[in-house]
Amino acid sequence: MSLQSIKYTRGSLEILDQLLLPVQSKYLPVRGVEDGWKVINKMQVRGAPAIAIVGCLSLAVEIHPEEFDSKKSLRQELEGKLNYLVSARPTAVNMKMAADELLSLANDLTKDDNVDVAAMKQRFLNATEAMLKKDIADNRAIGAHGAKAILQLVAAAAGAPMAGPVRVLTHCNTGSLATAGYGTALGVVRQLSELGKLEHIYCTETRPYNQGARLTAYELVHEKFPATLVLDSMVAALLRAKNVAAVVVGADRVAANGDTANKIGTYQIAVVAKHHGVPFFVAAPLTSIDLHIPSGDHIIIEERPDREMTHVGEHRIAAPGINCWNPAFDVTPASLITGIITERGVFQPAQLKETITKLLET
């Protein structure tokens, strides 16, 4: 059974505090937008899909007991709070996409004379809750498309009609803890396992916040997958020695040309995968694809505090006085990406803008 990182019923939201894992499993109440902003900014919840879900649900929890005297005042409240939530971690596009979608709904309802303020609030709550259900369904579709693509590539390379069990590498955390459930890149791994086609999954530690060691390893042990943790600096040796069939990572933002922002360290894994001829896949929902930016050069990269590099918990591990550069993400060029796995299929980066534009029109 997958881990549950988000517990929601109308008017109530709790999130699993990921800063305490794997030592302690503790759920935190999120009573409104201020709590939502804090748990996102402090990375007590992380992963682009989960950030969007928790952000939107924190707003739903806040407005649930409130009464508004007009649709205009409700719309203004929603706009201000959604914009505030987007600022918590700006690199991940999913929160911005969700905010735009909900604000568009609010604008339409404000103009609709057949909808009163109570009905408008109800429609807004329904829309946020629908996002939670859709994320899980989308993740399962991503898993199915990704597993199929990997197995087809492996079979074709071997000149065989069917691929045997495969070894896969992933980076950071993209499972149930990073989404509403099931996972994106880890959802692909989960689907391979369900098909009996997963021989082994390798996960990186993912310095400096150790999401791989703390979170992905925690999920893999929970699921009883055959899994091994490796240091970030071991990836080249791993791909050379262990017959890894594919690399699958998540994404915080994908540009129109396929350039992909993901957890720091992703870029160097893609370079090494290219050198060793290992397919490199990005698994992400359509909400992570930002067609408004032409390339990765336009993606804002969040920089995190020095302390995340210099300390582990309360213990300093770096020399006092040393300067630090701590970008949370890097951008992998589209030329290094074999395919982008979405809930609607697997696309080559060069096809992305045209294909996604057509899908969104249907």
UniProtKB/Swiss-Prot annotation:
Q: Which reaction does it catalyse?
A: 5-(methylsulfanyl)-alpha-D-ribose 1-phosphate = 5-(methylsulfanyl)-D-ribulose 1-phosphate
Keyword entries, A-Z: Amino-acid biosynthesis, Cytoplasm, Isomerase, Methionine biosynthesis, Nucleus
Locate the active site.
252
A GO molecular-function term, please?
S-methyl-5-thioribose-1-phosphate isomerase activity
EC assignment: the record states 5.3.1.23
Give coiled-coil spans as residue ranges.
Answer: none
Instruction: List the SUPFAM superfamilies.
Output: NagB/RpiA/CoA transferase-like (SSF100950)
Supply the Pfam families for this chain.
Answer: IF-2B
Its cellular-component GO annotations read: cytoplasm; nucleus
Q: What is its main location?
A: cytoplasm
Q: Name one GO biological process term.
A: L-methionine salvage from methylthioadenosine
Q: Which Gene3D superfamilies match?
A: translation initiation factor eif-2b, domain 1, Translation initiation factor eif-2b, domain 2
InterPro entries linked: IF-2B-related (IPR000649), IF-M1Pi (IPR005251), IF_2B-like_C (IPR042529), Initiation_fac_2B_a/b/d (IPR011559), M1Pi_N (IPR027363), NagB/RpiA_transferase-like (IPR037171)
- Pathway assigned in UniProt: Amino-acid biosynthesis; L-methionine biosynthesis via salvage pathway; L-methionine from S-methyl-5-thio-alpha-D-ribose 1-phosphate: step 1/6
Q: Which residues are annotated as site, described as Transition state stabilizer?
A: 172
Q: Where in the cell is it found?
A: Cytoplasm; Nucleus
Q: Which PANTHER family match?
A: METHYLTHIORIBOSE-1-PHOSPHATE ISOMERASE (PTHR43475:SF1)
NCBIfam families, from UniProt?
eIF-2B_rel, PRK05720.1, salvage_mtnA
To which protein family does this belong? Belongs to the eIF-2B alpha/beta/delta subunits family. MtnA subfamily.
Q: What does this chain do?
A: Catalyzes the interconversion of methylthioribose-1-phosphate (MTR-1-P) into methylthioribulose-1-phosphate (MTRu-1-P).
The name this protein goes by in its record: Methylthioribose-1-phosphate isomerase
